[in-house]
């Protein structure tokens, strides 16, 4: 399993496209974006107070205050915003400042109004010293010209959009959403809207959930439909999808039964072909990974629960990789103690669904065909390949479903 996670790295990446900020949330930048100019662009006050030369306040205290001549005020309002203050702070002088006001020339700090008082007309008393830069945001403190604002490969967050907007960047080059075609296979599979089921039929639950997971990972799900258990029908469907797909997902048919045709068909689609067929994971052992004519292909088990577990661990990273995401957001996780022993076999990675209450993780068990185990779970615990189980009371990391 570790080899599959680290070793299967298809070269395909979606191209870049320009995206206005209004539609850029969670999109993946195709190139770093740098600041076109300094931010905020001017030195400004972070407090209400007085702009001063810091050296004029050295040594002052409650018992030995200093006195400065009040020579003017920086104002805020539609008339003065956008213009430089026509005031210079000279030695022994101070200028009244509002929060956000442009620092006048000559000043290198702002003393908070709480540490001053006006003792007579044109004179203020200062009882606390300030250091250079105190109470001030430098002209390039948020970003210097040419500094990186957002990196390539990390999905854009709301705060990233705020930084770009502050810099006047209104369009970002982002990777196009990878088109992920999702096929279901099996004569027994019918659409979810089927009102009644004949004996042996099942509604296509996997395709609905897989499409949702593709969208969560930043992809564009494309329904491939339900393909019968007939190799030539599957081959025709896959060949038809290859030119318009960045990734193909095949639900069911990857096992070794007489009606499981995925591996044989994928071998004929194009080079380099199958990378691996069978992964040391439970559930999901018969998973297939391939690359055909530059398009990654993932074949999943037929049981919906197994398919969704494997796709979360292998398929979601593939969707992100093809979509240029090299810095995926961290999965939410909590630490909890196991409520009971978890047996496992060395050499196999086990994914165990759990409920978490009061810092205790209770394992949920059931047949791999049961979706109710997934819907009841708060998250999952991974038993690593080198372990032979985990004892009750062991502290584990639980990956929480979003």
For each feature predicted by the language model, list its residue ranges.
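Phosphate-interaction motifs
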Residues: 1-170
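Flexible glycine/proline-rich
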Residues: 16-17, 21-22, 31, 44, ...
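Short beta-strand segments
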Residues: 53, 96-98, 127, 151, ...
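Short glycine-rich anion-binding loops that position phosphate/pyrophosphate groups of nucleotides
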Residues: 57, 100-101, 187-188, 253-259, ...
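N-terminal small/polar loop signature for handling phosphorylated ligands or for N-terminal nucleophile
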Residues: 74-91, 110, 211-270
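Short glycine-rich, flexible loops that bind phosphorylated cofactors or substrates
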Residues: 104, 158, 256-258, 306
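Phosphate-binding glycine-rich loops and their immediate beta-loop-alpha structural context
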Residues: 135-250
């Amino acid at each position: 399993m570790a080899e599959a996670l680290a070793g299967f790295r298809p070269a395909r990446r979606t191209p870049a496209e320009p995206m206005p900020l209004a539609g850029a949330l969670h999109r993946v930048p195709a190139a770093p974006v740098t600041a076109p100019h300094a931010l905020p662009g001017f030195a400004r006050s972070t407090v209400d107070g007085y702009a001063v030369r810091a050296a004029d306040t050295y040594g002052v205290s409650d018992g030995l205050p200093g006195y400065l001549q009040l020579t003017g005020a920086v104002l805020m309002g539609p008339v003065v915003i956008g213009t430089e203050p026509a005031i210079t702070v000279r030695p022994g002088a101070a200028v009244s400042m509002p929060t956000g006001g442009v620092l006048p020339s000559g000043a290198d700090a702002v003393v908070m109004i709480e540490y001053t008082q006006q003792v007579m007309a044109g004179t203020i008393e200062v009882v606390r010293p300030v250091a250079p830069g105190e109470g001030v945001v430098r002209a390039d403190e948020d970003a210097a010209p040419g500094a990186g604002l957002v990196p390539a490969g990390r999905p854009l967050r709301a705060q990233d959009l705020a930084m770009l907007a502050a810099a006047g960047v209104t369009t970002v080059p982002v990777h196009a959403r990878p088109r992920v075609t999702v096929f279901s296979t099996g004569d027994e599979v019918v659409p979810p809207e089927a009102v009644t089921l004949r004996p042996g039929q099942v509604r296509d639950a996997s395709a609905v959930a897989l499409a949702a997971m593709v969208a969560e990972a930043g992809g564009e799900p494309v329904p491939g439909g339900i393909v019968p258990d007939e190799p030539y029908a599957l081959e025709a469907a896959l060949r038809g999808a290859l030119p318009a797909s960045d990734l193909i997902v095949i639900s069911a048919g990857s096992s070794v039964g007489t009606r499981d045709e995925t591996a044989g068909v994928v071998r004929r689609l194009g080079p380099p072909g199958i990378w691996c067929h069978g992964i040391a994971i439970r559930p999901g052992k018969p998973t297939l990974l391939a690359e055909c004519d530059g398009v990654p292909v993932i074949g999943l088990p037929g049981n919906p629960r197994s398919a969704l577990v494997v796709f979360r661990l292998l398929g979601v990273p593939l969707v992100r990789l093809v979509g240029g995401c090299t810095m995926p957001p961290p999965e939410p996780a909590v630490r909890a103690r196991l409520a009971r022993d978890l047996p496992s076999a060395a050499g196999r990675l086990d994914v165990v669904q759990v409920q978490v209450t009061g810092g205790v993780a209770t394992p949920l068990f059931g047949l791999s065909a049961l979706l109710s185990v997934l819907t009841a779970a708060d998250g999952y615990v991974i038993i690593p390949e080198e372990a032979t189980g985990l004892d009750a009371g062991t502290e584990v990391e639980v990956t929480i479903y979003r």
